[in-house]
Amino acid sequence: GQPKAAPSVTLFPPSSEELQANKATLVCLISDFYPGAVTVAWKADSSPVKAGVETTTPSKQSNNKYAASSYLSLTPEQWKSHRSYSCQVTHEGSTVEKTVAPTECS
């Protein structure tokens, strides 16, 4: 088998175009992990978020490692009413957390 590989996690905030369209989607990209099982948890400030979360099934990349993504759908009001949002990825017992914060100006 191949060695375990920890995922690299990137968290993207909603785009300004999206906010102008009265939508807000956070995207958490998880890539280069092996084996292909991850758990994704979202948090607003420090409270868990369950609603509006959609996580894809990990798919195998060309390098035989896995990639997945998780989406959190919010309203712009929800997005702006918290200090930060976090995407927590747990893989093989270790957790990677990435956080984005809404900027005041948009």
Curated annotation (Swiss-Prot):
Disulfide bonds join C28-C87. One of its GO terms (biological process) is immunoglobulin mediated immune response. GO terms for cellular component: blood microparticle; extracellular exosome; extracellular region; extracellular space; IgG immunoglobulin complex; plasma membrane. PANTHER family: IG-LIKE DOMAIN-CONTAINING PROTEIN, MHC CLASS II-RELATED. Keywords: Adaptive immunity, Bence-Jones protein, Cell membrane, Disulfide bond, Immunity, Immunoglobulin, Immunoglobulin domain, Membrane, Secreted. Signal peptide: none annotated. Constant region of immunoglobulin light chains. Immunoglobulins, also known as antibodies, are membrane-bound or secreted glycoproteins produced by B lymphocytes. In the recognition phase of humoral immunity, the membrane-bound immunoglobulins serve as receptors which, upon binding of a specific antigen, trigger the clonal expansion and differentiation of B lymphocytes into immunoglobulins-secreting plasma cells. Secreted immunoglobulins mediate the effector phase of humoral immunity, which results in the elimination of bound antigens. GO terms for molecular function: antigen binding. SUPFAM superfamilies: Immunoglobulin. Coiled coil: none annotated. It comes from the Eukaryota. The keyword Ribonucleoprotein does not apply. This is Immunoglobulin lambda constant 2. Residues 7-101 form the Ig-like domain. Displays the following serological isotype: Mcg-, Kern- and Oz-. The Mcg- isotype marker is characterized by Ala-6, Ser-8 and Thr-57; the Ke- marker by Ser-46 and the Oz- marker by Arg-83. It is found in: Secreted; Cell membrane. The gene is IGLC2. Pfam families: C1-set.
